[in-house]
A protein has these predicted regions:
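Periplasmic-binding protein-like
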Residues: 85-92, 110-113
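Short, well-structured alpha-helical segments in soluble
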Residues: 70-84
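Residues that mark the start of a beta-strand
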Residues: 27-29, 108
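Boundary at the C-terminal end of the N-terminal hydrophobic targeting segment
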Residues: 23-25
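Bacterial N-terminal signal peptides
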Residues: 8-20
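Extracytoplasmic "Venus flytrap"
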Residues: 31-56, 62-72, 92-95
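N-terminal secretory signal peptides that target proteins for export/translocation
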Residues: 1-6
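Extracytoplasmic ligand/sensor domains, especially the bilobed periplasmic-binding protein
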Residues: 100-113
């Protein structure tokens, strides 16, 4: 009886978690900003592998590749924030200052550096 209860409880939690994640995924729009091309088989490639896994889980994702660590980064971040993205991942060390600057302008958008 005890094992049955535990199995039922765990199964219920798994189902609840699965449907909760699916419901959240439909509402979250994530963007990734890359320093290089996605086909570089290096830093950017690995980030894009992660992005594709997030997308496979049901989240809406977009990405911009080849963004220099300059004023262009700020411009791209503002465009992504203005286009309805809920979370923006900046994947290069040189994006730190542009990310911090733009994040102050968009308090309802999550920025991950």
């Amino acid at each position: 009886m005890h094992k049955f209860f535990i199995r039922s409880f765990v199964s219920s939690l798994v189902l609840l978690f699965t449907f909760t994640v699916a419901a959240i995924a439909k509402d979250v729009k994530a963007a990734f900003v890359y320093i290089g091309p996605t086909g570089d088989h290096g830093w950017t490639y690995q980030h894009d592998v992660g992005r594709k896994a997030v997308e496979a889980a049901g989240f809406k994702t977009t990405y911009v590749e080849g963004v220099p660590e300059s004023a262009d980064a700020e411009r791209v971040l503002r465009q992504l924030a203005n286009s309805g993205h809920d979370v923006i991942f900046t994947t290069s060390f040189g994006y730190m200052n542009p990310t911090n600057k733009v994040a102050k302008e968009f308090p309802n958008v999550k920025f991950e550096h």
